């Protein structure tokens, strides 16, 4: 399959290496155009992938059968709009990033839009990407007009398992958002690995209560207890991990808070719900972000 991967960070390189190893015809796409992108990845089994792959080839993009987007949430809309005019209108665009809200910014895109969540963990160590832990990718149609592309889940399952197709992906997206609303801001503010959050049960409870209320109003059945149990499972299974938001804060980069807690706040306002704990955390992360961005050190990384 001919696939363009938009974004060559940790997640992008994970997909590029996996797709390449399984015989797919792939290219990367970088914000600053370059003819090649370097993919250096150590997999969970210790194997090493080191290749220079084609990048930013518009002819390749014009024949691509899938655009896989692995950018940070705040980078997605502008980049996808730029590439959509060259991508065939029948080729689906799959967005995999933390948070929600990018689809609302891309309603007029002609191509089929899919969205997903991923629990694989990968991190950068110098110029090398380390695939820390295997996980699951959940994908599904982003809008009502986007059809059944479950065959893609079958193809991607053979590349980087596990991959699951959902006809209603939004329920899964909300579940992942609940986890992100807990883990990302708390670890970023406490400067700690995920496992340390076991000591902050009161804050976790407060966040889960508020998120559950919003999810119920969105039309998906859940409870604070269900969310809390799921969040605690994720904290335990990723105890040693450094969250993406904490990585961003440590590197003085723009975070995805606007698409995680920020999205929750927007939906809460629509439903007339007060979410004071999430509001407090949102303001604290934005304050931290503005401190280093104001000093000029928070330079956005290339895709």
From Swiss-Prot:
It is found in: Cytoplasm. Its EC number is 1.1.1.169. Optimum pH is 6.25. The keyword Disulfide bond does not apply. InterPro entries: 6-PGluconate_DH-like_C_sf, 6PGD_dom2, ApbA, Ketopantoate_reductase, KPA_reductase, KPR_N, NAD(P)-bd_dom_sf. Keywords: Cytoplasm, NADP, Oxidoreductase, Pantothenate biosynthesis. GO terms for molecular function: 2-dehydropantoate 2-reductase activity; NADP binding. Transmembrane segments: none annotated. Pathway: Cofactor biosynthesis; (R)-pantothenate biosynthesis; (R)-pantoate from 3-methyl-2-oxobutanoate: step 2/2. Substrate binds at residues 98, 180, 184, 194, 244. It catalyses: (R)-pantoate + NADP(+) = 2-dehydropantoate + NADPH + H(+). Optimum temperature is 42 degrees Celsius. GO terms for biological process: pantothenate biosynthetic process. GO terms for cellular component: cytoplasm. The active site is at 176 (proton donor). NADP(+) binds at residues 7-12, 98, 122, 256. SUPFAM superfamilies: 6-phosphogluconate dehydrogenase C-terminal domain-like, NAD(P)-binding Rossmann-fold domains. Monomer. Catalyzes the NADPH-dependent reduction of ketopantoate into pantoic acid. Has a strong preference for NADPH over NADH as the electron acceptor. Pantoate, ketoisovalerate, oxaloacetate, pyruvate, 3-hydroxypyruvate, alpha-ketoglutarate, alpha-ketobutyrate, and acetaldehyde cannot serve as substrates for reduction. Belongs to the ketopantoate reductase family. This is 2-dehydropantoate 2-reductase. It comes from Salmonella typhimurium (strain LT2 / SGSC1412 / ATCC 700720).
């Amino acid at each position: 399959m001919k696939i363009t991967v938009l974004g060559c960070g940790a997640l992008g390189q994970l997909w590029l290496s996996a797709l390449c190893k399984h015989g797919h015809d792939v290219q990367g796409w970088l914000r600053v155009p370059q003819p090649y992108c370097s993919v250096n990845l150590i997999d969970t089994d210790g194997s090493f992938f080191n290749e220079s792959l084609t990048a930013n080839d518009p002819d390749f993009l014009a024949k691509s059968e899938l655009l896989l987007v692995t950018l940070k949430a705040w980078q997605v809309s502008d980049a996808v709009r730029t590439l959509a005019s060259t991508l065939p209108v029948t080729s689906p665009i799959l967005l995999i990033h933390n948070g929600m809200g990018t689809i609302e910014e891309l309603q007029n895109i002609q191509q089929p839009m899919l969205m997903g969540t991923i629990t694989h963990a990968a991190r950068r160590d110098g110029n090398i990407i380390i695939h820390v832990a295997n996980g699951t990718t959940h994908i599904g149609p982003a809008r009502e007009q986007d059809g059944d592309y479950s065959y893609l889940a079958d193809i991607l399952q053979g590349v980087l398992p596990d991959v699951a197709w959902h006809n209603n992906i939004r329920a899964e997206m909300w579940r992942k958002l609940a986890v992100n609303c807990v883990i990302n801001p708390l670890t970023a503010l406490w400067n700690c690995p995920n496992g340390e959050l076991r000591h902050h049960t009161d804050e976790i409870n407060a966040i889960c209560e508020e998120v559950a209320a919003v999810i119920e109003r969105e039309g998906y059945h859940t409870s604070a207890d269900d969310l809390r149990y799921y969040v605690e499972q994720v904290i335990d299974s990723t105890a040693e991990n450094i969250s993406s938001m904490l990585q961003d804060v440590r590197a003085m980069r723009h975070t995805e808070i606007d698409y995680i807690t920020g999205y929750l706040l927007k939906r809460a306002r629509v439903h007339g719900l007060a979410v004071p704990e999430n509001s407090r955390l949102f303001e604290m992360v934005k304050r931290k972000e503005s401190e280093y961005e104001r000093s000029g050190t928070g330079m956005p990384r290339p895709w």
